[in-house]
């Protein structure tokens, strides 16, 4: 039986199309770079027209990108961008907003508490947990280095 399974797997492998890894990386790089360029343009806009500095313009820039991402998710456009770009649209803050907005839209028929609030953090919760843990670890390493160097 094992020989038959191995033979089947080898035959399937010969006919299975190879994923275009290089092209997928190029698309992710270009779309992710475009999202970051839009973010930089928004930050420059806030600095120039609203008298922010580089440090204070970050929060309204992120909020604007999140709002745009949530709107594009609601209109079904961000899903098409994600299908084309893959990780290029999932890694920036817009991907996090997309995951929360799409879950909220999917479960809105079940009500605000049991539908939206319960299911909104299913995918995004992992990102939050690992982000907090990584920030804690990096903070402890930095604290240790500062104590050792002083």
Swiss-Prot record:
Keywords: Cell membrane, Membrane, Sporulation, Transmembrane, Transmembrane helix. The chain crosses the membrane at residues 30-50, 57-77, 84-104, 121-141. One of its GO terms (biological process) is sporulation resulting in formation of a cellular spore. One of its GO terms (cellular component) is plasma membrane. It is a multi-pass membrane protein. It comes from the Bacteria. Signal peptide: none annotated. It holds the Pfam family SpoVAC_SpoVAEB. It is found in: Cell membrane. PANTHER family: STAGE V SPORULATION PROTEIN AC, STAGE V SPORULATION PROTEIN AC-RELATED. This is Stage V sporulation protein AC. The gene is spoVAC.
């Amino acid at each position: 039986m094992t020989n038959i399974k191995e033979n089947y797997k080898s035959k399937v492998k010969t006919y299975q199309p190879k994923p275009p890894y290089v092209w997928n990386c190029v698309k992710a790089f270009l779309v992710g770079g475009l999202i970051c360029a839009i973010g930089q343009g928004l930050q420059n806009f806030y600095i120039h027209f609203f008298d922010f500095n580089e440090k204070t313009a970050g929060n309204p820039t992120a909020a604007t990108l999140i709002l745009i991402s949530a709107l594009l998710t609601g209109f079904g456009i961000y899903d098409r961008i994600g299908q084309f770009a893959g990780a290029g649209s999932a890694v920036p803050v817009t991907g996090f907003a997309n995951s929360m907005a799409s879950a909220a839209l999917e479960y809105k028929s079940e009500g605000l508490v049991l539908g939206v609030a319960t299911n909104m953090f299913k995918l995004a919760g992992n990102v939050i947990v690992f982000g907090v843990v990584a920030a804690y670890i990096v903070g402890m390493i930095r604290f240790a280095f500062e104590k050792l160097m002083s």
